Design a protein with these regions (language model features):
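Double-stranded RNA-binding/processing signature
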Residues: 1-295
Length: 295
């Protein structure tokens, strides 16, 4: 067991890392990547963790306001405040992550390290573990006094959205989420902003698994194409999510339908459920983790 061979500063650093994350990472490679935050594996973990952190932050922020609140400015502003390099750099210090010994790490690199830690939790133990680390490091400390509404929106059921969710492999639990997506207006927009982040995370986790050699830059470029409004709108047509003929050619509007569907599934069944629906929408590998670290 690699832990038994640790001594001196490295043993202390690993102990600090465990305490900060609230868990032990089983993989030595993941631990080394977080202690010396540079190189191919670190970049790939940061890429995935960035996307997963966005889900955790946006989901929490959306729940702090009424579903009929028309403006998303609070959500947008608070998201930027929570995930900025400055904010995440402070998180690294306050949560007790060990110092970087190999080089003088910039604030940007320290912020990347928080995101990589979330990606490492996903690779090591799955998306639920990543959510827990994101909440422990960023969401709970950053939003300590904000209310969490959490209730299912009071919306009439909508079989169009429920059928689309089932077609994507999701077992609907609370129909109100899908009724809210169908209702349009602020409710749909709030679900869609979360759904957009989940779609991005589904693409990111799939890329990590499918292409072990791809760099962060290569994956980012590929993801932009997969996440285009035109590509997502095409799937909306296939899923029967274009309610009005006059909207059929409006890719932005049609893509919102799919994003709202994914957001509804995420609130209904959790992160893994949202990733599953997203993978079905995008036609990509469903990768809730854990995964081969070096994949």
């Amino acid at each position: 067991m690699w832990r038994e061979r640790l001594d001196g500063p490295t043993a202390l650093d690993v102990a600090h890392l465990n305490a900060a994350l609230g868990r032990q990472l089983a993989s030595h490679e993941l631990v080394l990547a977080l202690l010396d935050p540079r190189g191919h594996l670190f970049q790939r973990l940061e890429y995935v963790g960035d996307a997963l952190l966005d889900i955790a932050v946006l989901r929490a922020l959306v729940l702090t306001e009424p579903w009929d609140e028309p403006s998303l400015s609070f959500v947008s502003d608070e998201q930027q405040a929570l995930v900025s390099d400055h904010a995440l750099g402070r998180v690294a210090a306050r949560r007790g992550l060990p110092d970087v010994r190999a080089f003088d790490a910039s604030r940007h690199r320290l912020a990347d390290r928080i995101e990589a830690a979330i990606g490492a939790a996903w690779a090591d133990a799955g998306v639920d573990a990543a959510e827990q680390v994101a909440d422990r490091l960023v969401v709970a400390p950053g939003l300590p006094h904000l209310p969490r509404a959490g209730a299912v929106p009071d919306s009439a059921p909508d079989m169009r959205y429920e059928d689309a969710a089932r077609l994507c492999g999701h077992d609907v639990r609370a129909p109100g989420w899908f009724g809210a997506a169908a209702a349009g207006g602020p409710r749909r927009r709030r679900l869609a902003v979360v759904g957009d982040a989940v779609l991005e995370a589904a693409c990111s986790t799939s890329q990590y698994v499918d292409d072990p050699l791809a760099t962060e830059a290569q994956m980012s470029e590929e993801r932009r194409g997969a996440m285009s409004n035109a590509a997502i709108a095409g799937r909306a047509h296939e899923l029967g999510l274009v309610p009005r003929k006059e909207d059929a050619d409006d890719c932005r509007s049609v893509a919102d339908e799919v994003q709202a569907l994914v957001g509804a599934a995420t609130f209904d069944g959790g992160f893994a459920a949202g990733l599953g629906v997203s993978a079905a929408v995008l036609g990509c590998t469903y990768a809730p983790g854990p995964v081969d670290v070096l994949a």
